[in-house]
Amino acid sequence: MVAITLPDGNVKEFDGATTVMEVAQSIGPGLAKATIAGRVDGKLVDASDPITQDASVEIVTAKDKDGVDIIRHSTAHLLGHAVKQLYPNVKMVIGPVIEDGFYYDIFSEKPFTPEDMAAIEKRMAELIKQNYDVIKKMTPREEAIKIFEERGEDYKLKLIADMPEEKELGLYHHQEYVDMCRGPHVPNTRFLKVFKLMKMSGAYWRGDAKNEQLQRIYGTAWADKKDLQAYIQRIEEAEKRDHRKIGKALNLFHMQEQSPGMVFWHPNGWTIYQVLEQYMRKVQKDNGYQEIKTPQIVDRSLWEKSGHWGNYATNMFTTSSESRDYAVKPMNCPCHVQVFNQGLKSYRELPIRLAEFGSCHRNEPSGSLHGLMRVRGFTQDDAHIFCTQAQIQEEVANFIKLTLDVYKDFGFDQIEMKLSTRPEKRVGTDESWDIAEKALADALDSSGLEWEYLPGEGAFYGPKIEFSLKDSLGRVWQCGTIQVDPNMPERLEAEFVNENNERETPIMLHRAILGSFERFLGMLIEHYAGWMPVWLAPQQVVVMNITDKQADACQNVASELQNAGLRAITDLRNEKIGFKIRERTLERIPYMLVLGDKEVESGQVNVRTREGENLGVMSVADFIELVQKAVAQKGRLTTKTDEE
C-alpha cells in the first residue's frame, strides 16, 4: 500500500507502486489530461516515474512556472528531433532552458541559414501534429554509450564521460530520436504547440574559444498563444530599444574590432556619462564617502596576496616590465585596503567609507561581449566601507536607503532585494555568519520593503544583498550590491585599534549602486528608448531661427541658457523650421526654442517639446525656471519631496 498526500491534505491510497499520472487520473480526467510532471516530496519528476513509497505529491501543469520550463526543455528536444531528421549528419551537443526559452548547440560542417531555421520550425510543427508520446527510459551506462556510439553523437559521449559516477542515465525517446537528460519532460508532444524559433548564433564547445565552433539555435515556448504573442511584442520593442542602435542614431558611442569590449565615447554619450559621474560624486560626498584614486596596473604580489592571481588569473590582463609581472586591475578592493592601511586607525575613526570611480578591465570571452552591457573595460561606482562588526547593520541600512533613493532619481521604482546566505563551502565561524546575516536581514527589514532569501548563494567569505531593477519592458537587471567581507582585510593585514587598545581586523563592506557606468547607461538608453529625462539629455535645448535675421538673437539666448547651467545649442541652418524641428525631435532634444521676428521684438521665446507639445511664448527667465524644475525632478515618477 502506497499513501499519497495531496497539497490540500487529502490522502489517496494505492495498492502498490504508482505514478504522478495515475495520481492525477484518480483525481479526475481533466487534471490527468493537463498533467505535465509532478513533485514528489518536493522533487520534480516525470509523470511516468514510479512512486514506490508513501509521499507528498503535487501535480505540475502548464499553469505552473515549472510546467512552462518543462515545456521549454521538451521543445529543445523536439528541435533536436527535427534537426536530425532534416540534417542527419549533424551532431547534437546540449539544449538547456534559459530565461523565456531554450537553445540547442549543434555541430554542423555547413552553417545553418535562415531558410534552414524556417525548415526546422516547419518540421517541428509537423512532428507536434503527430501527437506522439515522449518515452523515458532509465538506461544502464554501457547501453547508453552504445546507443550514442551507433548514432555518432560524439558530444553526448563526452558528456557521459563527464559523469563517471552515473551508472544509469535518463534517455528520452522522441520516436526514433534519442536524447539524454535528467528531466523531467512532457509526456506527449501536444503540450509543445506554442513555440517559435527566434535566432541563430555561434558558440564554442564548453564555452572555450579554443574549441570547435558550434551553431546555436534559440527558441521560445509557452503554455498559451497569448503569452507567446506578448513575448514576441516585448522582443520587437526591445529590438527597437537596442542601445547599440540608439547609440548609433544619437551619436553616443561606438565600438570597433581593434579594441573589443572597450567603448569609444562620442561627445553626446560622454556628456551623459559625465552627468552620471558628477551626480554620483555629489551623492557619495553628501553621504560621508571620501573619494580616492588608485593605480590601474599593480604588481602580481598584491594580487597573489588577495587571492585574485590564483583564482581569477584567466580574467586578468597582464603585462611585464623590468622582470616584474603586473595585472591591469579587474577590481578595486585590494587597492582600497592599501589606502586604509596607510597609518594605523582607531575605532573612533570607523566607519571609513572610501569611494572610487574605478576603471577596471576584465578579459571576458569575446563571444560574450554585447555593446555596453558586457564589456572588457568599465568604470564602477565602487566603494568600500571599513567598519566594526557592530556597525554592519547601520551601514547597510543607510546604504539601502541611499541606493533606493538613487534608483528613484533614474526613474526606477520597482526594485527587487535579495539576501544571499552562507554557502556550504565557506570560511569563518557559524557565529560570525549568524551575526552578518542577521545584520543584513535587520537592515532590509528596516527599509519597510519586501525582500527574499537566496539560501546558499553568498560568497565563500560573507553574505550579500543584491538589488535588481525592473525596466519599462518588465526586464529585470541586477545592479547594486553590498557584500560583507571579513576575509580580504585579514589577507591584506588591515587593522585598527579597538576600545581595549588591541589590534583588530575590520569588516569590509564592498558596495556599488549602479554597478558599472557602461552597463547602467546601456540600461538607461533602453529603458527610455533614448528619450532621456531632461537632466540626462546630452543637449537639453536647441535654439532655432526662422530666417537669418534672428541668428544673433538665437546666439544671445543660447548664451543666456548656457550661463544658467543648461546644455544648449543653436541651429541656424538655412532650412525650413519644420524640417529643423523634425530633425531635432529625432535627436530626442527635450526643448526646441523658435525665434521669429515677433519673439525677437518682444524678447521672448516660443517653446516646443520633443513630444510635439507647444508650450507657447514665454520669457527666457521663465523658460530657464521651467527647465531647472524638470532637471531637479530628475527621472522621478513623482515629485521629489523635501523629506527625500
Swiss-Prot record:
Residues 242-533 are annotated as: Catalytic. It catalyses: tRNA(Thr) + L-threonine + ATP = L-threonyl-tRNA(Thr) + AMP + diphosphate + H(+). PROSITE patterns: AA_TRNA_LIGASE_II, TGS. Keywords: Aminoacyl-tRNA synthetase, ATP-binding, Cytoplasm, Ligase, Metal-binding, Nucleotide-binding, Protein biosynthesis, RNA-binding, tRNA-binding, Zinc. Its EC number is 6.1.1.3. Binds 1 zinc ion per subunit. Its cofactor is Zn(2+). GO terms for molecular function: ATP binding; metal ion binding; threonine-tRNA ligase activity; tRNA binding. Transmembrane segments: none annotated. It is found in: Cytoplasm. One of its GO terms (biological process) is threonyl-tRNA aminoacylation. Pfam families: HGTP_anticodon, TGS, tRNA-synt_2b, tRNA_SAD. Zn(2+) binds at C333, H384, H510. InterPro entries: aa-tRNA-synt_IIb, aa-tRNA-synth_II, aa-tRNA-synth_II/BPL/LPL, Anticodon-bd, Anticodon-bd_dom_sf, Beta-grasp_dom_sf, TGS, TGS-like. Signal peptide: none annotated. One of its GO terms (cellular component) is cytosol. SUPFAM superfamilies: Class II aaRS ABD-related (SSF52954), Class II aaRS and biotin synthetases (SSF55681), TGS-like (SSF81271), ThrRS/AlaRS common domain (SSF55186). Homodimer. Catalyzes the attachment of threonine to tRNA(Thr) in a two-step reaction: L-threonine is first activated by ATP to form Thr-AMP and then transferred to the acceptor end of tRNA(Thr). Also edits incorrectly charged L-seryl-tRNA(Thr). Belongs to the class-II aminoacyl-tRNA synthetase family. HAMAP family: Thr_tRNA_synth (MF_00184). This is Threonine--tRNA ligase. The gene is thrS.
